[in-house]
C-alpha cells in the first residue's frame, strides 16, 4: 500500500517545482565587448556616467587589491553607480531591494579582451516582486545599456 501511495504522490510532488525562474524570463546580465584598453574603458565609463548625472559611489579595483596581498589576477574593476532620484521608487515599493542597490558594472579583461557586464535591475526587481515600478527598472536598464555603449563608442551621442 505504501508503495502505491508513493507512486501516486510522486507526480504531485514533482509538479510543484517551478517551470521557469527569473533568469529564464529576464537575462540577469547584459554583456558588452569594449574596443578600448582596460584602463581606457574604465575611464570612459566613469566620464560618461558622471556627465549624465550618475553618481559613482565606489570603484573597486579587484586586481589592485589582489596585488596588495601578493596575489595576481586579470584586471577587474566594479563601478557601483546610481541615481537616488530614480532608484528610490524601487526601494519604496520593496525595502528589501535596497540590499541590491546601487547598480553594479563590472569591467574585466579575459584573454586580452576587455568586457563589460551590467547587472540588470529589471531582473532583480522581478526577483523582489516589484510591480508598480517595474517600468522604472526597465527604463534604468535601457539607459544604462545606452550609456555603456556610448562610452565605448558603440552608440553615437
Label the predicted regions.
Residues 122-157:
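C-terminal partner/receptor-binding element of secreted or periplasmic proteins
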Residues 104-130:
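Beta-strand/loop substructures that line and gate deep hydrophobic ligand-binding cavities in soluble
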Residues 41, 45, 62, 140-143:
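Stable alpha-helical elements in mature extracytoplasmic
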Residues 19, 100-113, 149-157:
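Short secondary-structure transition/capping segments
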Residues 1-23:
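Bacterial Sec-dependent N-terminal signal peptides
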Residues 17-56, 149, 157:
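Terminal, regulation- and interaction-focused segments at domain boundaries
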Residues 46, 50, 54-103, 107:
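Compact, glycine-rich, soluble single-domain proteins
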